[in-house]
């Protein structure tokens, strides 16, 4: 499979759960929520994977988490945001509350 095929792969929510479980455990993530097109069931081959994590990680440790998530998803584009960066009442918070799917919890 070449890189273009990998980027166009669409994962199911169950696949995302099983692929990301060891990453979330390894980084001691408290909770992870899938949102965006994947949580709504409308992902296309070009969709990235949007994740909200409750990690407490900062700086290079957070970058390492994002890299490991991307690697676990065969290089698929990901957008990872920590709960500490979500502003109350923001569009992101509303989207997560409206259509987010919890895929990991401690």
Task: Give the residues covered by each predicted segment.
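Catalytic core of pol beta-like nucleotidyltransferases
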Residues: 1-31, 40-45, 56-106
């Amino acid at each position: 499979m070449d890189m273009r095929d990998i980027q166009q792969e669409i994962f199911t929510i169950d696949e995302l759960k099983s692929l990301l479980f060891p990453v979330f455990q390894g980084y001691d993530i408290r909770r992870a929520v899938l949102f965006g097109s994947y949580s709504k069931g409308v992902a296309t081959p070009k969709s990235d994977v949007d994740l909200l994590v409750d990690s407490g990680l900062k700086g290079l440790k957070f970058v390492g988490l994002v890299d490991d998530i991307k690697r676990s998803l065969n290089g698929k584009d990901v957008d990872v945001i920590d709960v500490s960066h979500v502003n109350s009442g923001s569009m992101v918070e509303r989207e997560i509350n409206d259509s987010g799917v919890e895929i990991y919890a401690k």
